[in-house]
Amino acid sequence: MAWHSQTWTFFQGEWHEGNPGIMGPRTHAAWLGSSVFDGGRVFDGLMPDIDRHAARVNRSAETLGLNPTMTAEAIIALAREGVKKFSPGTAIYVKPMYWGEADGPSTIMADPDSTQFCLCLFEAAMPPAMGGLSVTKGLYRRPSLETMPTDSKAGCLYPNNARI
């Protein structure tokens, strides 16, 4: 799959087509990793568990010390609105995200009141049904709660997983 497919992003009260710039070089999340996301799917006209994904992104934001700016219900309503921008039958990935924009009391902490939100929806085909699955053990392990915010869907966790 190409890294960029049909995409709609809700940011600062408006829908933007494509991949809009939403962070700058001073954005806390861009250099210190204060970002969270969640990911739901739309397929076959269904949007299963979107309520759980919306609630979890808010919990993840709080875990990272960010102040969520949207209710789960508002995220769900925006997702339903955004899905209408795609052709019927399109498989869509639904990705609500929060991040710290400004430094907080210390440079390494984000200012909770600077929390930004966007909802990104993009075309993403469902993977083909598989006949089986292979697993292996890698050299790296997932960090544990005393070293990383593993009780959240924090963006800072995923580069380590990609090394496996």
Model segments located where?
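Short, acidic/charged, Gly/Pro-enriched secondary-structure junctions
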Residues: 76-104
